[in-house]
UniProtKB/Swiss-Prot annotation:
EC identifiers of the protein: 1.13.11.27
Organism classification: Eukaryota, Viridiplantae, Streptophyta, Embryophyta, Tracheophyta
Catalytic EC class: oxidoreductase
Catalytic reaction equation(s): 3-(4-hydroxyphenyl)pyruvate + O2 = homogentisate + CO2
Domain of life per record: Eukaryota
Protein name as it appears in the record: 4-hydroxyphenylpyruvate dioxygenase
Alphabetical keyword list: Cytoplasm, Dioxygenase, Iron, Metal-binding, Oxidoreductase, Phenylalanine catabolism, Repeat, Tyrosine catabolism
Protein's pathway: Amino-acid degradation; L-phenylalanine degradation; acetoacetate and fumarate from L-phenylalanine: step 3/6; Cofactor biosynthesis; prenylquinone biosynthesis
Gene Ontology cellular-component terms listed: cytoplasm
Family: Belongs to the 4HPPD family.
Length: 442
């Protein structure tokens, strides 16, 4: 773990960073991708996503059922945790944790919390502002103390100093954007079930046979008020590099738009896109709508990789009206009639027909192909949603001779942005129409 500072020293030190160069968007056509291998600490992978919610039991079960992610571990009253209830659902390398507080009046010991950074008062403020939302994007790093100290030394705002969970696991957090934290976890041995303090969920209660083919988190997208300061802040303390860039001219519609930058780690398997709204369009940007309903910056959507998007979508759509997730409206038939001209022969006629039947969007870049689809918002507010994707192509061989897929293969759906915007705009119009009708009736 290396030499550690005291918690007071770490939390008070936020300083020796120099101001980065002024951020400026150049647009998709002028952007030149390069990987400077500039990470300031060793990042292994996305480890988990933590949601804060009012009811962890039922929210975790909905995501489990809707996404095909068995409930595998828990930390709650039954395990001795009197501070919060947390439930872990998992599919292959994708882990979601759902956390809700117990009453502080019944808490016997704050030391019983499995996630030591959890705060009941912080939760209540978070939930009142954001509703169901992502609290933490967790990265597995080689060394938590080194990652935290390197981040804070370069300007990261500390949220929770390094804590030793047991003699072989550590956790720390820094602020990312809004009320979202970037969590660092590391293990001195092979990781067990999850974090210390979690116990396995056995038997039929775990839905052990659920598997719709979802395998990992591809990217976690944040919406922010202003892109430049946030990009500079995150790049500054992580060392992550710009992987892709889009402006309103690249991806907007006649009615609304956004600017977007994707940040990536050295291996380009941890991808953090960031969006800002644009102004002066006919309609309010959907990014601005998000910021208003979320009361500030936050995670807009999570892109989940499927090994077979057709199977995943068939299973998810079966459950859309049975407690699962609904999807954004499908593109018009003309979208699929023109698909072969846009993406070539990478998909057969039968696969294109299946894309149309399931409402899947398809795009490609000079390296590979992307299949994608978006759910409607997963909670009461028009904020957080899920994207299901499959990337095709870009296969490489590692030093051990094993094949792997290059990160971000097929891009981020530049060719589908306008189609997605239209579908979101149509969805928002239905909400606005109801609000106008309700106001008139009142």
């Amino acid at each position: 773990m290396g030499k550690k500072q005291s918690e007071a020293e770490i939390l008070s030190s936020n300083s020796s960073n120099t101001s980065p160069a002024t951020f400026k968007l150049v647009g998709f056509n002028n952007f030149v991708r390069a990987n400077p291998k500039s990470d300031h600490f060793a990042v292994k992978r996305f480890h988990h996503i933590e949601f804060w919610c009012g009811d962890a039991t039922n929210t975790s079960r909905r995501f489990s059922w809707g996404l095909g992610m068995p409930l595998v571990a828990k930390s709650d009253l039954s395990t001795g945790n009197s501070v919060h209830a947390s439930y872990l659902v998992r599919s292959a390398n994708l882990s979601f944790v759902f956390t809700a507080p117990y009453s502080p009046s019944t808490t016997t010991s704050s030391g019983s919390a499995a996630i030591p950074s959890f705060s009941a008062s912080g939760f209540h403020s978070f939930a009142a502002k954001h509703g169901l939302a992502v609290r933490a994007i967790a990265l597995e790093v080689a060394d938590v103390a080194a990652a935290f100290e390197a981040s804070v030394a370069r300007g990261a705002r500390p949220a929770s100093a390094p804590v030793e969970l047991d003699d072989q696991a550590w956790l720390a957090e820094v602020e990312l954007y809004g009320d979202v934290v970037l969590r660092f976890v590391s293990f001195g041995r092979e990781e067990g079930l999850f974090l210390p303090g979690f116990e396995a969920v056995e038997g039929t209660a775990s839905f052990p046979d659920l598997d719709y083919g979802i395998r990992r988190l591809d990217h976690a997208v944040g919406n922010v008020t202003e892109l430049g300061p946030v990009v500079e802040y995150i790049k500054g303390f992580t060392g992550f590099h710009e992987f892709a860039e889009f402006t309103a001219e690249d991806v907007g519609t006649l009615e609304s738009g956004l600017n977007s930058v994707v940040l990536a780690n050295n291996e380009e398997m941890v991808l953090l896109p960031l969006n800002e709204p644009v102004y002066g369009t006919k309609r309010k940007s959907q990014i601005q709508t998000y910021l208003e309903h979320n009361e500030g910056a936050g995670v807009q959507h999570l892109a989940l990789v499927s090994e077979d998007i057709f199977r995943t979508l068939r299973e998810m759509r079966k459950r859309s009206c049975l407690g699962g997730f609904e999807f954004m409206p499908s593109p018009p038939p003309t979208y699929y009639k023109n698909l072969k001209n846009r993406v070539g022969d990478v998909l057969s006629d039968e696969q294109i027909k299946e894309c149309e039947d399931l409402g899947i969007l398809v795009d490609r870049d000079d390296q590979g192909t992307l299949l994608q689809i978006f759910t409607k918002p997963v909670g009461d507010r028009p904020t957080l949603f899920i994207e299901i994707i499959q990337r095709v192509g870009c296969m490489l061989k590692d030093d051990a001779g094993q094949m792997y897929q290059k990160g971000g293969c097929g891009g981020f759906g530049k060719g589908n942005f306008s189609e997605l915007f239209k579908s979101i705009e149509e969805y928002e119009k239905t909400l606005e129409a109801k609000q106008i009708t309700g106001s008139a009736a009142a």
